[in-house]
């Protein structure tokens, strides 16, 4: 776990607890997306470098997001600003999504394949994983041309490497004793 993930964990946990308490998980997801989108904008990054006071930085975020930012979100923005933590917003968001998945009894699966898979193939993989893990499955799919052939499936800390490259490596290892 990276330092950013370690720092992001309590922020995400606190946000998620507020979201559960107020039944506002989707709203908080949108708020986090909004904040991280603004913070990652190239023109806005200059403000995040410390050239502006935390008070005014918070005010800018709050003013831009008047329509979606409630009192709890204002407090989060102020806290992120005071602690100069806008750089870990992606980590906070990812952790929040994982907490939501756990809460809803969903596993998040990262699927990488050498070539583009059709939607029906991805759905078949999803069904197999749901039967295997006995949970709903959300697949995050990416094409990775670095994979020789086949696919790599990552669930939590478990990796199923079904690539040709891995099979060749295993064969090579077994022949070399």
UniProtKB/Swiss-Prot annotation:
UniProt xrefs under InterPro entries: ATP_synth_OSCP/delta_N_sf, ATPase_OSCP/dsu
Top-level division of the source organism's lineage: Bacteria
Record-given protein name: ATP synthase subunit delta
Function: F(1)F(0) ATP synthase produces ATP from ADP in the presence of a proton or sodium gradient. F-type ATPases consist of two structural domains, F(1) containing the extramembraneous catalytic core and F(0) containing the membrane proton channel, linked together by a central stalk and a peripheral stalk. During catalysis, ATP synthesis in the catalytic domain of F(1) is coupled via a rotary mechanism of the central stalk subunits to proton translocation.
Subunit structure: F-type ATPases have 2 components, F(1) - the catalytic core - and F(0) - the membrane proton channel. F(1) has five subunits: alpha(3), beta(3), gamma(1), delta(1), epsilon(1). F(0) has three main subunits: a(1), b(2) and c(10-14). The alpha and beta chains form an alternating ring which encloses part of the gamma chain. F(1) is attached to F(0) by a central stalk formed by the gamma and epsilon chains, while a peripheral stalk is formed by the delta and b chains.
Pfam family, one: OSCP
Similarity-based family: Belongs to the ATPase delta chain family.
Transmembrane helix listed as a keyword: no
UniProt keywords, alphabetically: ATP synthesis, Cell membrane, CF(1), Hydrogen ion transport, Ion transport, Membrane, Transport
GO terms for MF: proton-transporting ATP synthase activity, rotational mechanism
Organism of provenance: Buchnera aphidicola subsp. Acyrthosiphon pisum (strain Tuc7)
KW Ribonucleoprotein (keyword) present: no
GO CC term, one of those recorded: plasma membrane
Membrane topology type: Peripheral membrane protein
Signal peptide: none
């Amino acid at each position: 776990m990276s330092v950013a993930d370690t720092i992001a964990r309590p922020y995400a946990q606190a946000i998620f607890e507020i979201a559960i308490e107020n039944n506002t998980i989707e709203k908080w997801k949108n708020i986090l997306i909004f904040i991280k989108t603004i913070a990652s904008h190239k023109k806005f990054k200059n403000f995040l470098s410390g050239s502006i006071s935390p008070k005014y930085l918070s005010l800018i975020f709050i003013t831009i997001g008047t329509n979606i930012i409630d009192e709890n979100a204002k407090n989060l923005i102020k806290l992120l600003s005071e602690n100069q933590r806008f750089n870990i917003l992606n980590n906070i968001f990812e952790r929040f999504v994982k907490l939501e998945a756990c809460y809803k009894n969903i596993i998040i699966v990262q699927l990488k394949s050498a070539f583009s898979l059709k939607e029906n193939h991805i759905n078949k993989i999803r069904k197999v994983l749901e039967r295997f893990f006995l949970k709903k499955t959300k697949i995050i799919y990416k094409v990775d041309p670095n994979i020789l052939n086949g696919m790599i499936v990552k669930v939590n800390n478990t990796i199923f490497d079904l690539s040709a490259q891995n099979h060749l490596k295993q064969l090579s290892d077994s022949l070399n004793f």
